A protein has these predicted regions:
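Cross-family detector of peptidyl-prolyl cis-trans isomerase
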Residues: 2-178
Length: 178
């Protein structure tokens, strides 16, 4: 064939050129980064560049949407849906242990107005039933606990998938320490 393209060669070129925009779009998508302790995060909305950035010791107000990584992404808490327009943000001090450690790690470096999606592994996710945030609705709270702390599934080695959670965090306000 030396230097000429047959029908298959031309078809391959057409196929690749048609696919190029899809690859370019894929390359433009933000990639998750390791935020520490295995927490993966991606900024969906970067936040106001002139706004305060959250750091350890700051009090923050956040809106959350939490779902299980397993169980078809079952949503166990959604501040937007539950508030029906009257949203009450969660407030906690970063590093105080008031919320699961993965959520504290996930908010560090965010700026007010930003939205970040974080995938939180079991080691820094829910360890017991005293940790916040928990669903405001009793039935969702019970379902979360019976999924994450299910003794049969934990004995079967399913703990890593059951207690991995995904949160969308909207940083509403940073209250800088003293």
């Amino acid at each position: 064939m030396g230097g000429t393209l047959g029908r298959r060669g031309i078809g391959g070129v057409v196929l690749l050129s048609a696919a190029a925009p899809a690859f370019a779009e894929e390359a433009a998508r933000p990639r998750p980064v390791d935020l520490g302790s295995g927490v993966q995060g991606v900024d969906l909305i970067p936040g106001n560049p002139s706004a305060s950035e959250a750091s350890e010791g700051d009090a923050v107000r956040v809106l959350l949407k939490g779902r299980l990584f397993a169980k078809q992404g079952w949503v166990f808490t959604d501040d937007y849906k539950e508030g029906a327009g009257l949203v009450s943000p969660h407030e906690y001090v970063v590093g105080s242990g008031e919320v699961i450690r993965g959520l504290e790690i996930g908010v560090v470096g965010m700026r007010e107005g930003g939205v970040r999606r974080v995938v939180i592994p079991p080691a820094v996710s829910y360890q017991d039933k005293t940790q916040e945030p928990v669903p405001r609705d009793f039935s969702n709270r019970q379902r979360l606990y019976t999924t994450i702390f299910n003794p049969t599934r934990l004995a079967n080695g399913e703990g890593d998938t059951l207690s991995t959670v995904v949160f969308d965090i909207e940083l509403v306000r940073v209250l800088k320490r003293g």
